[in-house]
Amino acid sequence: MPKESKGKSAVRGESSIDSPSRTGAKPYNKRSAPTTSNGPSSKSQHTSKKPRFEKPNPSGSSSSLPGASKIKASIRQTKRLLAKPNLAPGTKIEAERRLKSLESDLEVASRKQVEKSRASRYHRVKFVERQKLVRRIARCKRNLARLNSDKAAQDLDSEGEASDDDDEGYGNQRLKESKMSKEELTKMLRWLRELLQYVMQYPADLRYVALFPTAEEGPSPPDAKEKDKSRQMAYQHLERVKKAIDDGQISEEVEVELSSKHRTLKKLATSTGGSSNGTTPTTSQAKNKQKMAKKTDKTTKNKRKNEEPISDDDDESDEDAAGAGGVKGDDFFAQDSDDEE
């Protein structure tokens, strides 16, 4: 065995001396890549990593709209085209129709931007107030259960003195609730559930009006005598929530839906017809505007047909442009629209 090992080393030494490229170089410094083998390669090991979670694309035509800056740029281009003199009648009708659809798309995109910014701004406030209301509802239900089980009033007083899961600074409120009657507790439970639905169903395009303005005071919802515009809108939202609970559109026991595993919370329909400024319309209003715009375009088109003869090519281009809605897949400026020369 030792003789064979010496012979191999001698053969290796001879081959390294004979080849000029191997002189003065380390033999294992630059090893060539391994040939194809049956085992798994390093690339396949890297590709077998856990894929990242990708959020699903929201359904709907409004989700495919571009940003507000792109829509504004398209509106400026369309206005420049309409400002040109001696514009062909077919191109002018097409550009006017496109301008109206772009303006409606801009309203939807701007409303989405407002909703996104306000959702991130009021997320923490809504979370804190939701936790406070859930804890108060749980305490009210415990008091009702103890009244139904005919326990002593001393137990209620001791429970009202201190509690680990309640907020700090509400000792007096807990004592009051522990001494309430059954009717008062049921009314309070109903009121707290309405306020919790107020928080959960609050529209994203409105400024949020907090129910707990200070840490020491209890919930103070907006009333009918409010002078501030945002608080008036909040009061209207609270009235809608109360009516929806009475009609059965949303659940009365909202805390049960929140504590469930799947959290299938029923949502109200679009509540407001605009933002706090009252200028941003809903998608249904935008669709109605588009329908009215198409009707007016048809009437103007018929009038111009009687006045000036329009070629068949212009009519076909108008019919193709009627289905275009906004910037998505729009090659309006790609075609040769400068027909005035």
Swiss-Prot record:
Q: Which GO terms describe its cellular component?
A: nucleolus
Compositionally biased region (Polar residues): 32-45
- What subcellular locations does the record give? Nucleus, Nucleolus
Any coiled-coil regions, as ranges:
90-155
Sequence segments annotated as region (Disordered): 1-115, 151-178, 257-341
Which residue stretches does the UniProt record annotate as biased composition, category Acidic residues? 156-169, 309-321
Superkingdom: Eukaryota
Quote the biased-composition stretches of kind Basic and acidic residues, using this chain's numbering.
Answer: 93-115, 294-308
In UniProt terms, what function does this protein have?
A: Involved in rRNA processing.
* Protein's UniProt name: rRNA-processing protein EFG1
Organism, by scientific name, is Mycosarcoma maydis (Corn smut fungus)
